[in-house]
């Protein structure tokens, strides 16, 4: 049992995301789908939530996983190390929490990986269209994702 996740459709309701009792935030959302791509390209794209993962996969970025929020934990770090990734593309939200998450990820992961934080024009990659994602990210991360 991993758990169930629900999201409020109102931006004013808090918390926005609800997890079932016993939900395992120690996992990386989508790792089971992304693992072959991560191994092949030695690169993982790290985003905050499930919706971000869905949108990135929709845009063709198959090596994307979610951390279930704005911080990474030790269990998730172990999974990242075991994934075969040497590079982490960090696409946390463009807000205070996302900036703190970026710093926390770098601090926790240390020198184990190479890091890239692409610039995006929206607060959240999950709010972008597939065309916007491809327009803004292709030139920034293409070199580390494709031979």
What are these model-derived regions, one by one?
Residues 64-66, 113-117:
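Conserved beta-strand scaffold positions in the cores of enzyme catalytic domains, especially
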Residues 46, 83-97:
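Acidic beta-strand-to-loop metal/phosphate-binding motif
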Residues 68-72, 93-96, 119-120:
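Short, acidic/turn-prone active-site loops that include or flank metal/cofactor-
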Residues 36-40, 126-147:
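Short, small/acidic-rich helices and loops at N termini and domain boundaries
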Residues 1-83, 102:
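Phosphate-handling DNA/RNA-contact segment within nucleic-acid enzymes
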Residues 100-110:
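Short, aromatic/basic amphipathic alpha-helical patches
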Residues 119-127:
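A short acidic, often aromatic-flanked loop/helix-cap motif at beta-alpha or helix-coil junctions
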């Amino acid at each position: 049992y991993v758990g169930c996740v629900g999201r409020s459709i109102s931006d004013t309701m808090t918390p926005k995301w609800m997890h079932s009792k016993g939900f395992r935030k120690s996992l990386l959302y989508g790792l089971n789908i992304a693992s072959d791509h991560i191994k092949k390209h030695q690169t993982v794209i790290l985003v905050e939530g499930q919706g971000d993962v869905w949108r990135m996969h929709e845009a063709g970025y198959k090596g994307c996983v979610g951390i279930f929020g704005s911080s990474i934990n030790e269990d998730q770090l172990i999974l990242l190390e075991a994934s075969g990734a040497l590079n982490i593309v960090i696409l946390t939200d463009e807000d205070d929490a996302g900036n703190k998450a970026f710093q926390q990820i770098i601090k926790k992961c240390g020198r184990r990986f190479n890091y890239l934080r692409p610039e995006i024009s929206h607060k959240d990659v999950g709010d972008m269209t597939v065309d916007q994602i491809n327009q803004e990210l292709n030139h920034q991360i293409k070199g580390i994702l494709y031979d």
